[in-house]
Amino acid sequence: SCLLLQFTDKRFQPVHDLTIGVEFGARGAAGALLVYDITRRTASNVEEAFINTAKEIYEK
């Protein structure tokens, strides 16, 4: 939600509501977007987990 707000309105909102049920809105999506901090070493571990999760969702 905050990322979308940044891209659409070019503003940051430090306090936000949780995006409950986002997995339901993602059903039938044609793509996915992975955003992470490449300056952090632990961020590289995110890629494999993201791909595995995306595959699981796609196969349902």
UniProtKB/Swiss-Prot annotation:
Question: What membrane topology was assigned to this protein in its record?
Answer: Lipid-anchor
Q: What is this protein called?
A: Ras-related protein Rab-2A
| Annotated organism of origin | Mesocricetus auratus (Golden hamster)
Q: Name one GO cellular component term.
A: autophagosome membrane
This protein's UniProt keywords: Cytoplasmic vesicle, Endoplasmic reticulum, ER-Golgi transport, Golgi apparatus, GTP-binding, Hydrolase, Lipoprotein, Magnesium, Membrane, Metal-binding, Nucleotide-binding, Protein transport, Transport
- Quaternary context: Interacts with PRKCI. Interacts with TRIP11. Interacts (in GTP-bound form) with GARIN1B. Interacts (GTP-bound) with HOPS complex component VPS39; interaction contributes to obtaining a functional HOPS complex that promotes autophagosome-lysosome membrane fusion driven by STX17-SNAP29-VAMP8. May interact with VPS41.
Q: Which family does it belong to?
A: Belongs to the small GTPase superfamily. Rab family.
Q: Which residues bind GTP?
A: 1-2, 19
Q: Which residue stretches, if any, does this entry annotate as coiled coil?
A: none
Location(s), subcellular: Endoplasmic reticulum-Golgi intermediate compartment membrane; Melanosome; Endoplasmic reticulum membrane; Golgi apparatus membrane
- Give the primary localization class: endoplasmic reticulum
Known regulation of its activity is: Regulated by guanine nucleotide exchange factors (GEFs) which promote the exchange of bound GDP for free GTP, GTPase activating proteins (GAPs) which increase the GTP hydrolysis activity, and GDP dissociation inhibitors (GDIs) which inhibit the dissociation of the nucleotide from the GTPase.
Q: Where is the signal peptide?
A: none
> For this protein, what is the EC number?
3.6.5.2
Identify the enzyme class: hydrolase
What processes does the entry annotate via GO biological process terms? autophagosome-lysosome fusion; Golgi organization; protein transport
Question: Where Mg(2+) is bound, by residue?
Answer: 1, 19
PTM field: Prenylated. Prenylation is required for association with cellular membranes.
Could you cite one Gene Ontology molecular function of this protein? G protein activity
Q: Where is this motif: Effector region?
A: 16-24
Query: What's its job?
Result: The small GTPases Rab are key regulators of intracellular membrane trafficking, from the formation of transport vesicles to their fusion with membranes. Rabs cycle between active GTP-bound and inactive GDP-bound states. In their active state, drive transport of vesicular carriers from donor organelles to acceptor organelles to regulate the membrane traffic that maintains organelle identity and morphology.
Q: Which domain of life is it from?
A: Eukaryota
Q: Which cofactor does it need?
A: Mg(2+)
UniProt catalytic activity = GTP + H2O = GDP + phosphate + H(+)
